[in-house]
Every structure is written in C-alpha cells, then in structure tokens.
C-alpha cells in the first residue's frame, strides 16, 4: 500500500532565527517512527542535505549532538532529519529503512521545491552506514526512482558488518566494560535475527548488508561509489579505546573507514576522503567520547558542500 505523504505535520519557527521547521508524520496515528523533521531556509533552497542519526537517534538527538543542521539551513540548504524505523523497539530485518528512505527523498524534493541535482546525504554511526548503503543502491540500480546523491558522508559509521560481529564477540568475551557488554549482547542478538547467524555461517548475508566488505572483490557494495564524492569522519583515539573499552584498532570503526577510502582510491575515486578528527568527539554534556557527531566541523562542511555543488 502506498504511504500517503504529509498525512500530518507540525510547523513552527526555530528559536533564534527565522527559518521554519516542520515535522512530517508519514503513517497516520504513528508519531514514534516513519517521520522526519524538515528545516526550511528563508530563501530559495540551494539544495538538500539529509542527515541520519545513529542507533535510536531521533531528529532531536541529532540537533543536540551537532550544529550541522542549523548551520546548513542558515547557509540556504533544506535539511531533512529522518527517523524512519524505531530501532529501539524493532529489528529492521527486511531493510524497511532503505525502502522508506527511497520514497522520502523524491517526495521532499517535490514538496519543498528543492533543486534535483543538489543533494548530499550522510549521518553518524548507523546513520552513516545507512547513508552509504542508500547511495550505493542508488548508483547500483538502474532505477530513476532512487534519487542519486551528489555526495555522501559518514561520521564514524560501522561499514563492515562482519568486523562489527567480531568486535561485539570480542567485547563480550573480555567482559570489561558494562556498557560494551550490554551493547554487544543486544547487537549480537539482533545480528542473528537480521542475518541468520554468524558471518561464518552466512557470509553472503553479511556481505550484502555491508556498505564496505573487504573480503569481497572491490570492497563489495563500496564499488558503486567509485565515482561519488565520499567523506568519512573519524576520531581515531586509540588510547581512549584502550582505557575505556580494552579494545584495539581492529575493534574501531576506523579500520573500516580507512579501508573503504583506500579501496575507493584504488578504484580511481579522487574525491574519497578520510577526515581525521582526533580529540574532537564529545557528548552533548561535554563528556569525551570519540563516537559522536560533534567531531564534524559544520562550517568547514558547508564550505566543502558549496564547492562540491557549485553553490555560491
């Protein structure tokens, strides 16, 4: 059944400046998931920036962690922050997120009169992986309904689901950090449901689900980004990982991110960047943590985006 667009929306003005913000709920009676926040510039839109939060990350969470949305809308971009699947209470074993995202993009472009050829997508953690995967499918599929981004970015996203399984297995085994133990136990449970079991049992399922898979030819799905500008941000604070998680470089997302960029460069991508943000990751309360959106510099990002999209 086709999901009706703009079944219900709330509109208000953002405090401090004149841009409007709308929250659009796509399923009648459901305000928990399948919705998105739109930040609307007070000028003609220069382009679309889609920002996806991490695991269970709502639009409000995203706006608390980074000033990128408000910086982008002030610069003239229409900003969309989706929350299409409630990760906290559901397991997206059918990749419903991808299907919903594919339908959201053209609807937003049409509804908010956004230029079709000025589109960047990205996100933090799981959101970065989802942005990468969406972009890969857009360039892989011969389907005009999947709007192709001009560029994609990720802020410390896990890209290789096999490596992530190995990391969770290791953290559970060493039994060091309570936070790591709880997260690892829950994520391994989810992986068993989503992929059928372990990578050794179902290697193809892990390859298909990964946005970068070093065991596959040309990096698996990553090969579809060989002509797409890609930015992967990372705060590779190995000492923090050692002291707080008893991990290593092998347990860090930096392993996937650096490998993916190297693979893209091998494929001839001259616009693939590994952006090092050592020491710049912090929680909204100021606590040091190298896995937060705060590592991205919003002002520098907009300069990059404007240059890439030829926006003055």
Residue ranges and their predicted role:
Residues 287-312:
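Catalytic active-site module of serine/aspartate enzymes centered on a nucleophile-bearing elbow/loop
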Residues 110-111, 116-175:
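Primarily recognizes the serine-hydrolase "nucleophile elbow" in alpha/beta-hydrolase
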Residues 92-113, 133:
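Alpha/beta-hydrolase active-site loop
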């Amino acid at each position: 059944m086709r999901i009706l667009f703009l079944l219900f929306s709330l509109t208000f003005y953002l405090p401090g400046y004149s841009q409007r913000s709308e929250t659009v709920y796509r399923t009648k009676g459901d305000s928990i998931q399948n919705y998105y926040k739109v930040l609307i510039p007070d000028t003609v839109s220069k382009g679309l920036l889609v920002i996806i939060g991490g695991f269970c990350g709502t639009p409000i969470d995203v706006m608390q962690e980074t000033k990128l949305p408000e910086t982008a809308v002030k610069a003239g971009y229409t900003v969309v922050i989706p929350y299409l699947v409630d990760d906290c209470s559901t397991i997206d074993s059918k990749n419903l997120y991808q299907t919903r995202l594919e339908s959201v993009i053209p609807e937003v472009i049409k509804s908010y009169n956004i230029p079709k050829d000025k589109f960047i997508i990205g996100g933090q953690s799981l959101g970065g992986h989802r942005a990468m995967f969406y972009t890969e499918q857009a360039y892989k599929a011969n389907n005009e309904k999947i709007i192709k981004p001009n560029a994609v970015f990720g802020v410390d996203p896990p890209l290789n689901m096999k490596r992530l399984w190995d990391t969770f297995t290791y953290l559970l085994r060493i039994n060091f950090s309570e936070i790591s133990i709880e997260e690892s136990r829950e994520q391994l449970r989810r992986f068993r449901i989503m992929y059928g079991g372990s990578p050794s049992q179902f290697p193809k399922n892990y390859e298909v689900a990964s946005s970068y898979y070093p065991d596959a030819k040309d990096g698996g799905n990553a090969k579809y980004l060989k002509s797409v500008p890609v930015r992967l941000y990372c705060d590779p604070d190995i000492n923090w990982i050692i002291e707080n998680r008893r991990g290593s470089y092998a347990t860090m997302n930096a392993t996937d991110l650096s490998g993916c960029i190297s693979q893209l460069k091998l494929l001839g991508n001259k616009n693939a960047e590994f952006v090092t943000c050592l020491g710049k990751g912090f929680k909204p309360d100021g606590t040091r943590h190298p896995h937060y959106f705060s590592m991205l510099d919003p002002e520098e990002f907009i300069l990059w985006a404007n240059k890439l999209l030829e926006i003055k």
